[in-house]
Amino acid sequence: MDIDYRIAIVLAPVVIAASWAVFNIGAAALRQIQGFLDREA
């Protein structure tokens, strides 16, 4: 049974975009949380 590479070709850009978005949002969220914790202290 051969693997259908068309699925990988279609999903690859979606996975890359999603991981890039999670990385950027995660970095911004961490900065916001750190700023909030710094204000509390």
Swiss-Prot record:
Instruction: Give the main localization category.
Output: membrane
Listed GO biological process terms: photosynthesis
Instruction: List localization entries.
Output: Cellular thylakoid membrane
- Keyword entries, A-Z: Membrane, Photosynthesis, Photosystem II, Thylakoid, Transmembrane, Transmembrane helix
Membrane-related topology note: Single-pass membrane protein
Q: Which GO terms describe its molecular function?
A: manganese ion binding
Family indicated by similarity: Belongs to the PsbY family.
Quaternary arrangement and interactors, per the entry? PSII is composed of 1 copy each of membrane proteins PsbA, PsbB, PsbC, PsbD, PsbE, PsbF, PsbH, PsbI, PsbJ, PsbK, PsbL, PsbM, PsbT, PsbX, PsbY, PsbZ, Psb30/Ycf12, peripheral proteins PsbO, CyanoQ (PsbQ), PsbU, PsbV and a large number of cofactors. It forms dimeric complexes.
Q: Which HAMAP family match?
A: PSII_PsbY
Q: What does this protein do?
A: Loosely associated component of the core of photosystem II (PSII), it is not always seen in crystals. PSII is a light-driven water plastoquinone oxidoreductase, using light energy to abstract electrons from H(2)O, generating a proton gradient subsequently used for ATP formation.
Name of the protein described by the UniProt record: Photosystem II reaction center protein Y
